[in-house]
Amino acid sequence: MRLIPLAQAAQVGKWAAAHIAKRINDFKPTAERPFVLGLPTGGTPLATYKALIELYQAGEVSFEHVVTFNMDEYIGIPADHPESYRSFMYTNFFNHVNIQEANINLLNGNAEDHEAECQRYEDKIKSYGKINLFMGGVGNDGHIAFNEPASSLSSRTRIKTLTEDTRIANSRFFDGDINQVPKYALTIGVGTLLDAEEVMILVTGHNKALALEAAVEGSVNHLWTVSALQLHPKAVIVCDEPSQQELKVKTVKYFSELEAENIKGF
């Protein structure tokens, strides 16, 4: 596992965006051989999306031959609801780059048959072989996507009941009213995420410090689903200083020295 310890959340966004752009450019995608990118929603990746848009506008990366798969979607709110993850992605990213509509893949939280929708999504991912890079965030309790504590580490795309903690955390997007936050969501599984060629998790803020500690220094544990990254051959965690508060000083020092060349300029 790689750990990229940076000072501020804005630096996390810029580093992650530069990493994605480099991966896309090195891949040299074409219509027949697209780069497949997994994407999250939430507050943490906003800085990354902003930086990616800037790189696109500067002509440093193109999304013309990039296929995307999002991590999750709420069940029971309209697709055009301002807080649906579909709306989030178009507002904060898709509307600002040259991605083709046909290359955007999102879970349908209003599908009549949720299990069939989850299987369709898994099959669509497999049709591309694999996801080349999956970017994600992490919850205060260590969940990745909506794989809440005690989720199977081999789980696939499925329906999940959201914990009260997650709904409280997400209520900030619903005028602070937990009753407006959906109770269920469709989400990729931990196993789905681990199938990706590379996984990059963004961690910012002191409230994520325990989750980062569990991911880096803890044991692999289904109560902290982010810890499953330890099983991945190509995992990278990009974090800011406040989120590093629970890590041992020697851990941060070790990775700071190891990644010194990759941190330069950020």
Swiss-Prot record:
- GO BP of this protein: carbohydrate metabolic process; glucosamine catabolic process; N-acetylglucosamine catabolic process; N-acetylneuraminate catabolic process
Q: Which reaction does it catalyse?
A: alpha-D-glucosamine 6-phosphate + H2O = beta-D-fructose 6-phosphate + NH4(+)
- Organism domain of life: Bacteria
- Site positions for Part of the allosteric site, renumbered to this chain? S151, R158, K160, T161, Y254
Q: Which UniProt keywords apply?
A: Allosteric enzyme, Carbohydrate metabolism, Hydrolase
Q: Which residues form a coiled coil?
A: none
Give the matching NCBIfam families.
nagB, PRK00443.1-5
**Record's protein name:** Glucosamine-6-phosphate deaminase
